[in-house]
Amino acid sequence: KALGITTKPVIIGAFTLLKLLRYVGKKQATDYAHAVIAAYAGLLEKFVAAGAEWVQFDEPYLVHDLTSEDIALFETLYQGILAKKGSGKVLLQTYFGDVRDCYGNITALAFDGIGLDFLEGRKTKELVEANGFPQDKVLFAGLVNGKNIWKNHYGKTLKVINALKAKNINVVLNTSCSLLHVPYTLKNETKLPEKYTEHFAFAEEKLQELAELKKLADVDYKLDAAFLENTFLFATRPDCRNLAVQKRVAAIREEDFTRLPAFKEREAIQKKAFALPLFPTTTIGSFPQTADVKKNRTARRKGEISEDAYVEFNQKKIADWVQIQEEIGLDVLVHGEFERNDMVEYFGEQLSGYLFTEKAWVQSYGTRCVKPPVIWGD
């Protein structure tokens, strides 16, 4: 508030929480409904008391195939929780699919806003058109993809927006899901040519797209510069084909999918060759990327050392660690993968059709991040 920023608390919803829990003994989700309602209602009251105008409950489990028991549990939970919202507004957010099994149940509850995924939700548009949308609620329409890095096609998106507005639906333009799944900004990418980056939209750029779409939706956009630029971009995408790759794919025969010799024969050959014990010992294939390993790779990337010096360092590391494995008596040795950085990026560099960024990091899990290559062509 001191910075002039209006924040919106976002927490995982009660229904998704109960559906993802693992239950032991005879108790099931319904046995915990009363306690969960009390906890969420208390949390909602605290958010509202602290000045939150909107509170968002994420309920991704609603896009699953739901039973009548699931729907009954969902209704029970939110009838209890929403009874305590007071002057606050509650947004129910869904993503990664549509809510075909419970659309009517959701819209009948006292939510102030409902977020629907219009991209991966194959039936979302159909559900809204066939059943309408309550006039007293706000539809948070997920029309800008929150999972991929590609620019939004304004022409297609504006058609959906106009169709919703024609039904007098109170619409807020939204991403299809959290922007956690995409890199932060294109501003950090200084080495990729514009012929590639002009097709990308990371998190900051997707917010800019939302702002542009909001503006375009309120005007005769067909002659607007932003719309025309976007239309031209999609009409002139560069050729991403690799004829050599396509030729190899076309030449694949059915027998190419059959590995020879047969498994039993390979198994016998390998057992004889390696003579491993019944339970062979080994380690994870990748050893820690220590400071000196990272320093060696960085020096090579900056051109501070030669390729031969880079390879010599890695070979020495491999030799040292093979010796350690032999000394402690491991049966299956690994070479430690000292030549690679992130696994996804490293193997992508061995293939055609990929682009590589400088700082387009995304979360893998927990605090671990990866910088995956971009699939551009064949």
Model-derived features: positions:
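Domain-level signal for soluble alpha/beta catalytic cores
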Residues: K1-D378
